[in-house]
């Protein structure tokens, strides 16, 4: 195998805007700032909400309503 062809891995810190600090190994040589992480993302925190704009979901269900007979 050839030597000195692989990138160097170094330990960096990824800092989220919520204050969470994550230490990871990466090929980049500087620390990074994140806008969102698993600690503050709505999907992971359970604060996710579904927004139905103007009853569009209901209109879709009504428009494409199939009976069991039509599916067979």
Swiss-Prot record:
Residues that coordinate or bind Zn(2+): 16, 18, 37, 40
Cofactor: Zn(2+)
Cofactor note: Binds 1 zinc ion per subunit.
GO CC annotation: ribonucleoprotein complex; ribosome
MF GO annotations: metal ion binding; rRNA binding; structural constituent of ribosome
Keyword annotations of the record: Metal-binding, Ribonucleoprotein, Ribosomal protein, RNA-binding, rRNA-binding, Zinc
InterPro entries assigned: Ribosomal_bL28/bL31-like_sf, Ribosomal_bL31, Ribosomal_bL31_A, Ribosomal_bL31_sf
GO BP terms, alphabetized: translation
Domain of life: Bacteria
Keyword presence, NADP: no
Alphabetical list of Pfam families matching this protein: Ribosomal_L31
Keyword S-adenosyl-L-methionine: no
PROSITE patterns per UniProt: RIBOSOMAL_L31 (PS01143)
Function in brief: Binds the 23S rRNA.
Subunit structure of this chain's protein: Part of the 50S ribosomal subunit.
Family, similarity comment: Belongs to the bacterial ribosomal protein bL31 family. Type A subfamily.
Name of protein: Large ribosomal subunit protein bL31
Source taxonomy: Bacteria, Pseudomonadati, Pseudomonadota, Gammaproteobacteria, Enterobacterales
């Amino acid at each position: 195998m050839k030597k000195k062809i692989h990138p160097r891995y170094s330990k960096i810190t990824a800092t989220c805007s919520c204050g969470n600090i994550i230490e990871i190994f990466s090929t980049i040589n500087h620390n990074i700032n994140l806008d969102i992480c698993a600690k503050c993302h709505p999907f992971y925190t359970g604060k996710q909400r579904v927004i139905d704009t103007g009853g569009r979901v209901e209109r879709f269900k009504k428009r494409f309503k199939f009976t069991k007979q039509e599916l067979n």
